[in-house]
UniProtKB/Swiss-Prot annotation:
Assigned protein family: Belongs to the complex I 23 kDa subunit family.
Membrane spanning stretches: none
A biological process from GO: photosynthesis, light reaction
Keyword NAD assigned: yes
SUPFAM superfamilies: 4Fe-4S ferredoxins (SSF54862)
Record GO terms (molecular function): 4 iron, 4 sulfur cluster binding; iron ion binding; NADH dehydrogenase (ubiquinone) activity; quinone binding
Keyword Secreted on entry: no
Cofactor: [4Fe-4S] cluster
The protein, known as: NAD(P)H-quinone oxidoreductase subunit I, chloroplastic
One term under GO cellular component: chloroplast thylakoid membrane
Binding, [4Fe-4S] cluster 1: 64, 67, 70, 114
Compartment(s): Plastid, Chloroplast thylakoid membrane
Length: 167
């Protein structure tokens, strides 16, 4: 009879412990019930990107001196810089510049270390395509300025996310 009583007490303790764990989870669920949703309806609503957002790279062909600093600081040696040495003026002349955004990790080193500031990060992040070869942007595609999210009147912009109170 004694083993039966100890098993019953053990069973009661396990039941109380399980009910406590379920109650803790339920209290966490209830604490999240009065918060505002964090998600947005993406194609119809867009967040305004922060000032230091690292989106697609913008390139200004006329400012580039073909120094290849961007290639040296890139962790994956991504930018392709084709240049020709002009012997009469002893300077490099840029022929072609391209970046493959299918490989780019958007670290921003090329923008940060460019001595002539011919590279800059834009707020454009919608780069998805069905063909990965379309992600290889040459100097013409890199030179196009993106349409600002703020200027698009068909999309509702959300300036900031709801603040989470940790009280």
């Amino acid at each position: 009879m004694l083993p039966m009583i100890t098993e019953f007490i053990n069973y009661g303790q396990q039941t109380i412990r399980a009910a406590r764990y379920i109650g803790q989870g339920f209290m966490i669920t209830l604490s999240h019930a009065n918060r505002l949703p964090v998600t947005i309806q993406y194609p119809y609503e867009k967040l305004i990107t922060s000032e230091r957002f690292r989106g697609r790279i913008h390139f200004e062909f006329d400012k580039c001196i073909a120094c290849e600093v961007c290639v040296r600081v890139c962790p994956i040696d991504l930018p392709v810089v084709d240049w020709k040495l002009e012997t009469d003026i002893r300077k490099k002349r840029l022929l072609n510049y391209s970046i493959d955004f299918g490989i780019c990790i958007f670290c921003g080193n090329c923008v940060e270390y460019c001595p002539t500031n011919c590279l800059s990060m834009t707020e454009e992040y919608e780069l998805s395509t069905y063909d990965r070869h379309e992600l290889n942007y040459n100097q013409i595609a890199l030179g196009r300025l993106p349409m600002s999210v703020i200027d698009d009147y068909t999309i509702r912009t959300i300036s900031n996310l709801p603040q989470i109170n940790n009280e």
